[in-house]
């Protein structure tokens, strides 16, 4: 952290990603790979203004700010470090903002985007975050399957509005429970270059996509509502898939999901 509100980070990784029967690693010629190798370095920056930070001996916790928080990241794949590791560049950015809108509560907004330069096997693409559990994840799509969509250029929106009981607080019996309502909307749009689109019949990509995985050039959108502050701890969300509601051949999807979350609120 160079100064208050501006921090940088630097990292490196070496990994092998193994295939399985659900997520096979198959070349266009039909041969099967055992694993995908990746070696990369990563640099990033986080910029905030007037943010409260709780500092611990070896870590710190960001407590929030009324201003937008900007994050930037750059990853470079290093070829020939491992057998099969490839050269690529990945640029990502995001903005997180929590505007107060009294007396209507507050919003929690995150916008993310990125671009991958180079030809990479699909495990190194942006694999958009599905949620295969019953637990709510604010940065994942509740009705999306794992490995359903991949992109090398993308932008995503995660939006919540917390009404702080402005509606439920008007109902006499529920008012005593202090339940609070939440509106949720999430969406993502992305594209794939021909050299990375493993869903094409005559693909130029290093690997074929698993069954059902495609680009998300038609935006994926899901919306829903939730109730939070149940026993001051629990949150229940009801989410509907708005687009991509028809399954592809051999694919199962869910158009409705119920998620449970745990968050202490005061």
Task: Explain the meaning of each model-derived region.
Residues 1-266:
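Exposed, low-structure sequence patches enriched in small/polar residues
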């Amino acid at each position: 952290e160079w100064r208050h509100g501006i921090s940088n980070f630097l990292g490196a990784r070496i990994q092998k990603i193994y295939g399985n029967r659900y997520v096979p690693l198959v070349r266009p010629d039909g041969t099967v790979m055992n694993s995908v190798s990746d070696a990369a370095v990563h640099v990033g920056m986080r910029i905030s203004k007037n943010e409260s930070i709780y500092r611990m001996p070896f870590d710190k916790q960001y407590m929030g700010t009324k201003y937008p928080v900007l994050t930037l990241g750059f990853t470079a794949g290093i070829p020939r470090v491992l057998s099969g590791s490839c050269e690529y560049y990945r640029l990502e950015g995001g903005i997180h903002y929590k505007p107060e809108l009294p007396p209507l509560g507050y919003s929690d907004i995150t916008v993310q985007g990125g671009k991958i330069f180079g030809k990479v096997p699909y495990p190194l693409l942006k694999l958009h975050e599905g949620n295969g559990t019953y637990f709510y994840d604010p940065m994942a799509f509740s009705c999306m399957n794992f490995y359903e969509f991949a992109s090398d250029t993308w932008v995503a929106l995660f939006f919540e509005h917390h009404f702080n009981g402005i509606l439920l607080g008007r109902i006499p019996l529920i008012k005593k429970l202090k339940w609070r309502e939440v509106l949720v909307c999430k969406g993502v749009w992305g594209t794939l270059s021909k050299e990375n689109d493993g869903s094409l019949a005559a693909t130029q990509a290093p690997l074929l996509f698993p069954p059902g995985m495609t680009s998300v050039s038609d935006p994926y959108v899901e919306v829903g509502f939730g109730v939070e502050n149940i026993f001051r701890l629990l949150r229940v969300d009801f989410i509907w898939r708005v687009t991509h509601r028809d399954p592809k051949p051999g694919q199962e999807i869910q158009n409705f999901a119920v998620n449970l979350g745990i968050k202490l609120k005061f």
